[in-house]
Curated annotation (Swiss-Prot):
The keyword Translocase does not apply. The gene is rplS. One of its GO terms (molecular function) is structural constituent of ribosome. Keywords: Ribonucleoprotein, Ribosomal protein. This is Large ribosomal subunit protein bL19. PANTHER family: LARGE RIBOSOMAL SUBUNIT PROTEIN BL19M, RIBOSOMAL PROTEIN L19. SUPFAM superfamilies: Translation proteins SH3-like domain. It comes from Colwellia psychrerythraea (strain 34H / ATCC BAA-681) (Vibrio psychroerythus). GO terms for cellular component: cytosolic large ribosomal subunit. InterPro entries: Ribosomal_bL19, Ribosomal_bL19_CS, Ribosomal_bL19_sf, Translation_prot_SH3-like_sf.
Length: 117
């Protein structure tokens, strides 16, 4: 029984996702349906948490909008998520960056991870 479930989940999982980690700045293109029209809306921010659970994987993105912190949790393999683009890699040493909620301004900045030679 579990093999059948695994096969069904494997079929529904997206394969074209980029590798990203907490601390990375990403742009998530989200499909928004208003009345009968559908459009893409960009949500750009820092990934503060990643939950890897196969088909049920999720990640949390945080951004500051008009001086107010906005966090949004996206299901990684959801059909609502159209695409994910990594803008810059962040150099952090923790898996969950919830401490960024308390910081503001320059203290909330994350160092950029430099490419290896």
């Amino acid at each position: 029984m579990s093999k059948i479930l695994e096969m069904l989940e494997q079929e529904q999982m997206k394969t074209d996702l980029p590798a990203f980690a907490p601390g990375d700045t990403v742009v998530v293109q989200v499909k928004v349906t208003e009345a009968d029209k559908s459009r893409l809306q960009a949500f750009e921010g820092v990934v503060i948490a990643v939950k890897s659970r196969g088909l049920h994987s999720a990640f949390t993105v945080r951004k500051i909008s008009n001086g107010v912190g906005v966090e949004r949790v996206f299901q990684t393999h959801s059909p609502i998520v159209d695409s994910i683009e990594v803008k810059r890699r962040g150099d952090v040493r923790q898996a969950k960056l919830y401490y960024l909620r308390e910081l503001s301004g320059r203290k909330a900045r994350i160092k950029e991870k430099l490419a290896k030679k």
